[in-house]
């Protein structure tokens, strides 16, 4: 259980961010629309959750169980938002791991749990991420993160992946106790940064995250990693690319050419 305790300690630690809803229109400067602030999702968008597959192979005999587990984590984060009560992401991850093991008739050892849950804090960045972040930073774009993970957990994740220095701030849904894609999660970032919500552009590899951001009033860009597709019944982002590097290039071009509103 050491891994679970470490994950939970990281999740419970850290400060809260300001909560609220930002209204108003996009900011302009010198008659032109100011570039949006880029809000990056973390798990699967920046960090490679697939790095946990060997641990699932060892624990379950099939590395593909990783996807079943992570889908369960996301499902029950939505249950916590829609039906309550709120539980932080690490607790849901641990509960989903227990559910997955029970459903498959597997008894997980403490070592198995440790490797999987501790592994969430040490995920590597996708190979295309660093170049993409550098491209946007070189263009003068402001970069922040928004994640379902708790504040201290994401700080560890970004530091361990070598990405922390790219971001001016990291935001967590813990501030509003409602998981993405709830509108409050995105709007709390705008409130904390002191900008209208349409001054934000989410970058994510999850269709549900893109839909949530667009419905909240943000712009969005979709990273169509292998196996990731947009939701056909939802609003569509103006930027889609096959990898983070390409999406970053498209974002720079789009934000440089935005006319005033």
Regions inferred by a protein language model and the residue ranges of each:
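A metal-dependent, Asp-based hydrolase signature
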Residues: 77-115
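Substrate-recognition element of Asp-dependent hydrolases with the DxDx(T/V) motif
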Residues: 112-124, 129-159, 171-173
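Active-site neighborhood of HAD-like aspartate-dependent phosphohydrolases
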Residues: 31-74
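An amphipathic alpha-helix signature
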Residues: 53, 66, 70, 90, ...
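Boundary at the C-terminal end of the N-terminal hydrophobic targeting segment
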Residues: 24-28
